[in-house]
């Protein structure tokens, strides 16, 4: 499937040099933009290009344009503020370039994230009326408890959460925590994936991970079955 790469330059107050944010764009002209945010230090493509493959899968299913980004750590900048601000910057870019990215000047946004990326989404989604659905995979508390609680309390769209029952980083209980906090959501769903760790390792769990956005954004109720999923890795 087609994709293009661009670099956004974000100015940082008090810093001589700004940040360069690489975006990978998988285009579709249906008025929907799906923004993907990986975990902390997560590469834009992920292990074995799993995020690129997942984006292609979303594009193939005609869910929307996919915009991918990395989640680097900067020693000279405060964490988690820079992680949150980078994501906001990319969302703002998507909204201001909606026609170019999605074929619609005022696009609908779906947000999906993993671990710290999911935490960031939980914190900021409620600030954007254009965001209709969010997918939180193995969500962590990296964005800060207060930010997550306030963010989810404000969000009135659809919330989809999935985590492995053997998650050794955030624990399967994180899914229930985020579910309980999303008490303003129009729809909220939680799926605990059996025999699955934090990274969704293994061919079966990779296929399940590939189907998570189909469940959240396209109503695929076969999730978390791996059947029909895309092989992301062995």
Where are the language model's segments positioned?
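Short, surface-exposed "cap/lid" segments of acyl-processing enzymes
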Residues: 16-18, 24-70
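Alpha/beta-hydrolase
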Residues: 36-37, 137, 193
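Short alpha-helix in the alpha/beta-hydrolase fold that links the catalytic acid
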Residues: 49, 148, 157, 171-181, ...
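C-terminal catalytic histidine-bearing segment of alpha/beta-hydrolase fold enzymes
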Residues: 77-81, 176-179, 184-234
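Alpha/beta-hydrolase active-site loop
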Residues: 77-102
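Primarily recognizes the serine-hydrolase "nucleophile elbow" in alpha/beta-hydrolase
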Residues: 93-154
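Acidic catalytic loop of the alpha/beta-hydrolase fold
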Residues: 142-143, 166-170, 198-199
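Short beta-strand/loop motif that positions the catalytic acidic residue
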Residues: 155-156, 161-163, 167
